[in-house]
Design a protein with these regions (language model features):
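Conserved, structured core segments of small domains
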Residues: 2-103
Length: 103
């Protein structure tokens, strides 16, 4: 299984301006986040500001993660990045650099 970093940011243009409607959206967002954590789909969710944050997922594929975060759109835009473990990335990068240097 791979790990994925999701960076999310609120889309202010689609949020309701009525405070009661905005509260309803926030309650739904937090309930969704709680569900992702409770089921283990997300291993960590955090905030940088009140408008943007991150989540860490462990999943079989990027498209699985995209499916899990789709319900938060259009209120939040997300960027999904696969996390390559240090040793795997180091070995791949050095192997390619050594091949290029040997030419």
């Amino acid at each position: 299984m791979s790990r994925y970093l999701v960076l999310y940011r609120a889309n202010a243009s689609v949020w309701p301006v009525d405070p009661k409607e905005s509260l309803a959206v926030l309650e739904g967002v937090f309930a969704g986040g709680d569900q992702l954590l409770r089921t283990g789909m997300a291993t960590e969710i955090g905030w940088f500001t009140a408008q943007e944050g991150y989540a860490i997922f462990q999943a079989d594929s990027k498209d699985s993660v995209v499916g899990m975060i789709q319900p938060f759109f259009p209120y939040y835009s997300q960027d999904v990045h696969e996390i390559v473990p240090w040793d795997q990335a180091k070995n791949a990068i050095l192997e390619n650099a050594r091949r290029a240097a040997a030419r």
